[in-house]
Structure formats: C-alpha cells, structure tokens
A protein has these predicted regions:
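Short acidic/glycine-rich loops and adjacent helix/strand connectors
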Residues: 1-339
C-alpha cells in the first residue's frame, strides 16, 4: 500500500500565520499560530504550531512531501518593484517596513526570510520541496471546499502577487482565472487606509463597517471621486486623493483628500459626525465597486453560483447586497477568508 502524500501549507512572514496539513488531499490538521501565542493576527513564525504538529502528532518533517506557501514570491517582488520604480522618488517610502500594515513590512525578500526562519527552526534537517502558489490562486482554491460543483469565484483583498481583485471559473476539480485588476487599485487597501485615517488599527475594518451604519450620506458623492468605476468591471483609485502607491500607510491620502474629508482622527479622540459620515461614504462606495465587479462576472460567466474569498469577503454588508441586487442565486463565503 502506497504511503499517503503529505502536503504542508505554511503561512509565515505575513499576517495570520499558521499551518495546514493535507494527507492525500484530505485536511488532517489546521493550526492558527494566534491560538497558541495569544497575539491576534500574529505575524510571527508559527513555532508553536510546528511543535504541536511534530511533537504531539504522528508526523515529522521527513514525512512531508511538499511545503506550500500562498505567494509567488518572484511575481510579488516584480510587482512591488514595478510600483516603486514607476513612482520615484516618493515611492521609495514603500521600502520602509512602517509603510505596510498586514505584511511583515519586507515583502520584497519574503522567500529569503522564510528560508532563514525554516533553517532556524529545523537546523540541518532536509527541507521538503517548496511549491509557491499564486496568492489569489490560493484564495480562489476555496472553491474546492465549497458546496458547488461549478461556480464563479471572486477574490478581493489588500493585494496579491500581481493584483488586488480577480475572478475565476470553477468546474469540478478545475479552476481558471478569467479577470484581474491592478496591484494598488485595491478596495482592501483603501479600506485599511481609511480605517487608519479614522483612528483605528489594522484589522479593525469591521469596526469601521459598523460605524458606517451610524453615518449620513454627507460625503458619498464626493467619495465616488475617490473610486472611479470603469468598463468591464474595472475601477481605479483616484491618485488625486490616494497616495498609498507612493507612501503606503505612512501617508496614504493626499492633501486634497484631507481638504475634502478632514484630517486624520487620532486613536482615542472623540468620534464626531464627520468620522461617521466618512465611514458611511467608504462603505457605500465599497459596496458599489464590489457590485460593479460582480455584475461584470455575472455578465461574462455562466454559473449562477458565486464564491467570495479574500479579506474583502469579510464585508458582510457588501455580501448581502450581492445576494439582494444581482442575479446570483447562491453565494458562499468561507468561514475563514484569510490566507
């Protein structure tokens, strides 16, 4: 009887680190490092997850046939340098770790840092072959555990290796990308930047989504100038307002944005009507952009089933709009939309 093929998925040097072990395609264990080190959305190498996997389960590193990570690091580095070299000298700020929220901050050399971390963990032990999976491909693969035999898949997050929004067709055991949209034209990135502008921390986007319900449509029309909808499901962030592709989170918005929507709120400051109204505008325009993409997918792909993945899939209000305002008959969002 042949030994089962063991594939170990690893998330490290980015947010929500952890492990997942598959044996002959079936999930055996899944560990989120934050459950052990008690640090929400931890970026630390999953040492405790490895300890539990290899010390308390019937596994060793020698049993692992392939190690996978949810990034194509060459494509990621190429995309990052394309942005940096295209917007110099201001974009040199993107090389500073503080310019990034969800990553370790040094995404350019992600693969090298991962190898160093693995060597520190396992010393001279032979490491299994590494398979790098495109970031949005990894998100889209959630289709395979969905309840659908066929579906359209929409992925939206901060950014992947080459894009921040993408669409796929899934049939049986096949998955094919059909559409994608730029690296820094990102609803996820915009929402994170606005979350910071409103005085909250990264990963508190859900708080801003809730705050939006308390706001008035004061800024909605003006915020539509920030996210410009275009043909074929595309949109772009207006660089007159958004400077995240030059400064990251160090200075994500331009002076024009500040003149239009007000200065940043400091953490702990009083929440005023203008903060609630800005959150409301952000949420409304985010929903409009999501629906713009979904309607393009609906027009160009035959399935009446939709799977949504990536960080923007956590925006439950936008998801409800998809069910209510599009022709998709069934929408499935994974309980865990992380990497």
């Amino acid at each position: 009887m042949a030994r089962p093929v063991n594939i170990l998925g690893l998330v490290s040097k980015t947010h929500d680190t952890g492990l997942a072990l598959l044996c002959d395609g079936q999930p055996k264990v899944i560990f989120e490092e934050e459950r052990f080190n008690r640090e929400k959305h931890t970026k630390k190498f999953p040492h405790r997850s490895f300890e539990i996997l290899f010390n308390h389960a019937e596994n060793s590193l020698a049993d692992i046939d392939y190690l996978t990570i949810p990034w194509d690091t060459k494509l990621l580095a190429a995309s990052f340098f394309r942005v940096v070299t295209g917007n110099m000298p201001a974009s040199l700020h993107l090389l500073r770790p503080a310019a990034h929220a969800t990553q370790d901050g040094r995404i350019v050399n992600l693969w090298m840092r991962l190898q160093i971390a693995m060597r520190r963990r396992f010393r001279s032990m032979k490491l299994p072959p590494l398979v790098q999976v495109g970031h949005h491909d990894a998100h889209a693969a959630i289709f395979f555990v969905s309840p659908f035999e066929d579906a359209s898949v929409m992925v939206m997050d901060g950014h992947g290796d080459v894009c921040a929004s993408s669409a796929y067709e899934g049939h049986g055991n096949q998955l094919r990308q059909t559409w994608q949209l730029g690296f820094f034209d990102s609803l996820g990135m915009l929402y994170t930047c606005a979350t910071q502008h409103l005085g909250f921390k990264p990963f508190e986007e859900g708080t801003v989504m809730a705050l939006a319900a308390c706001g008035e449509p004061t800024y909605v029309d003006r915020f539509r100038d920030v996210v410009i909808l275009e043909d074929d499901g595309r949109f772009r962030l207006n660089r007159d307002y958004v400077s995240v592709d030059r400064y990251g989170l160090l200075r994500p918005f331009t002076q024009k944005f500040l003149d239009t929507f007000g200065p940043p709120r400091l953490p702990g400051d009083e929440l005023k009507d203008r903060h609630r109204d800005l959150a409301h505008a952000l949420q409304v325009v985010t929903e409009e952009a999501v629906l713009h993409i979904v309607r393009h997918i609906e027009r160009t792909q035959p399935s009446k089933n939709l799977v949504i993945s990536g960080g923007v899939a956590l925006n439950c209000v936008a998801n409800a709009r998809i069910l209510r305002d599009t022709g998709f008959e069934r929408v499935w969002v994974p309980p865990c939309a992380s990497d």
